[in-house]
Regions:
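Catalytic cores and adjacent flexible loops of soluble metabolic enzymes
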Residues: 1-191
Length: 191
């Protein structure tokens, strides 16, 4: 399921020690969570060690965010627009910041804490390279996250939409497509 739908599982690291422990298991992808996104030492080490580095920028002030600009050309870096509030209200999603980040960084995604999938759909429609949502098998379980986490059905909806949005953006040129030739040939100028 996760390979077929291109769903990657990864872990957050909160320290250099965590980073080294995770790297001993896999050096594919690591996430620096919002509260640690100011930690340039951790970011530098992650960029040296991992193939992909995801940084959630929810808790950064403007000055701290600008310090990340020096990494803007790194292909292995994915910046996640995030608002660190649980659960997040639609009016607090602040997608203006998402669009601002897209002007600066090559790879911008979205980490959503809103109930439902509408925020993820918006991010996908605006070409987010990655969507991160919390996942649960049961929304009635204890804990803050389970109340706004996605279930399996929601996750499949997002992966299906991601595929459709990708297909919407395939460049087919400006001329007549093969699929249109029958209509063009048989109906044009008919009336």
């Amino acid at each position: 399921c996760s390979r077929k739908n291109k769903i990657n599982c990864f872990a957050c690291v909160w320290s250099i020690e965590d980073l080294k422990t995770l790297a001993s298991v896999s050096n594919e992808i690591v996430k620096i969570p919002s509260p640690e996104a100011y930690n340039l030492e951790l970011i530098k080490e992650a960029l040296k060690t991992f193939k992909k580095v995801v940084i959630s920028v929810g808790c950064l002030n403007q000055k701290e965010l600008k310090k990340l600009f020096k990494y803007k050309k790194k292909n292995k870096l994915i910046i996640l627009h995030c608002v660190s509030a649980y659960p997040l209200k639609p009016e607090d999603c602040n997608f203006k910041k998402f669009h601002y980040l897209k002007k600066i960084f090559k790879n911008v995604g979205y980490s959503g804490h809103m109930n439902g999938i509408e925020d993820a759909i918006y991010a996908l429609a605006n070409k987010a390279v990655m969507i991160e949502k919390h996942f649960t098998t049961n929304r009635n379980l204890q804990g803050r996250d389970n109340k706004f986490s996605l279930n399996e059905k929601d996750m499949f909806k997002i992966t299906d939409l991601r595929e459709k949005f990708y297909n919407f953006n395939i460049d087919r040129g400006l001329g007549i497509q093969k699929k249109e030739k029958d209509i063009f040939k048989n109906y044009r100028g008919r009336w």
